[in-house]
Structures are given as C-alpha cells and as structure tokens.
Amino acid sequence: FDTWWLSAQSAFRQNGTAVASIAMRARNRIYVRGYDELLLPHLAEALNSNPGCRKLIVLHLTGSHEPVCSNWPRDKAVFKPLDTEEVCYDNSIHYTDSLLGQVFAMLETRRASVMYFSDHGLEYDPTKEHVYFHGGIKPSQQAYHVPMFIWYSPTLGEHVDRQTVNSVFSTAYNDYLINAWMGVTRPAQPKTPEEVITRWQGKSDVFDANHNVFNYKALRNSFK
C-alpha cells in the first residue's frame, strides 16, 4: 500500500501520542491549519498519485470535537440562530456529512471504500458552561456513542455484502475490522468484516481515560 496521513489536527498537538506514532509510519504526511474541508485537495492529490498502486489514505478530521463552535465555517450554517453549543453541534454534524458526501463523489468511479468512525463520543450536560465535553472519568454510555460505517463505491457492485449491525460493536476491535476490510489476513483472525462483526458484536467492555474497565451496558445512559 501507498500510505497517506492527511490531518486537520496539528502534528504538534499529537506529539508523544499514540496517534502521532501511527501517523509517523505513513509514507506521506500532510497537516493543514483550518477547517476539515482543506483536506480535500490533498485527498485528490493522493488519489491521483501513483496510478495503479493500492492506497490507504487516512483523513484525520476535527469533526464535532469541542470547542464545537470553532470547528466549522459559519457561512455553512443551516441551523440557526447560532447562539448555543447545541446549534453549533448540529451544524458541525451537517458540515461533516457534507464533507463526506464530497469524499464519496471523488471515489464514486474508483474501486474504493471508506471506513468512517470517531475515536470517542461526547458527554452532554445542559447545566454546564460548555455543554459538550469528554467523558474521560466516570463516563456514561454517551461517552462511547460514535458513528461508524463502511461505504463502498458503486464500481464494486455485487462484490460486497451490505448490512446493518443492530447491536453493540466496540471500536476496541477496529484493529481486526480494519485488517479484514483491507484484505490483510493473519492466522486465526477473521478474514472479512462480516466475520469480525459476527465474532465481536455484543461485547461491551469499555475503559475510561484512567484505563479502568467497565461494562458498557451497566453504565448510566447519560451524564445528567
């Protein structure tokens, strides 16, 4: 694979983190200052480089990370008035959705697939000054609610199995899922995304910022 790491989060911010160690292994690394959409020209560059070479391209987005009102352009607002973090959060989701639509359009005629997921969720407490925040300590289930899906280009046709997973699936098993999705096989590990999901769906152990392990199903539903 020709590997690309395209990030809207600064390299300095990631120094010394697990994310930085992963990013440093990519053959090509590009960091931008600004909104997530600034990554799209670099995605086009990556797609058009080395024709015929298989590629793994990581788009490291800011998304709806707090401070949520700062992470998307105000001229893209569809929900108004912009006077609460709740409205900013809704607009940030719409902005990311629009961005993903542009990514899919760039890949529509290619033999390509996209795996999308967030690394963590956000807690919500309307009584706080900043109503969205990390659930690092004493988390509720909200802290672990993240979007995740695999999209396949129409050019792949009937070569993929499309389904919806209607049970808990932890991103703790994404290492196995990504391997299977990319066609990387290892002894005694599932060989397809469907096999990974079948083996680990319903598993509900999670951990917090202090590496304390909890049963997700035993956590309270929300922070407040």
Enumerate the predicted regions with their spans.
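Aromatic-acidic/polar surface patches that form glycan- and anion
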Residues: 32-36, 85, 89-96, 163-171
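Hydrophobic/aromatic residues located in beta-strands of well-ordered beta-sheets
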Residues: 3, 114-116, 148
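Metal-dependent active-site segment of extracytoplasmic phospho-/sulfohydrolases and closely related
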Residues: 95-133, 175-182
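Active-site-proximal alpha/beta segments of enzymes that process anionic O-linked groups
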Residues: 1-77, 145, 171, 176-202
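Active-site-proximal cap/lid insertion segments
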Residues: 11-15, 62-110, 128, 136-147
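Alpha-helical scaffolding within the catalytic cores
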Residues: 41-45, 132-137
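Membrane-interface soluble catalytic domains
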Residues: 105-107, 128, 137-139, 150-224
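Short glycine/proline- and charge-enriched loop/turn segments
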Residues: 20-27, 74-84, 130-135, 156-159
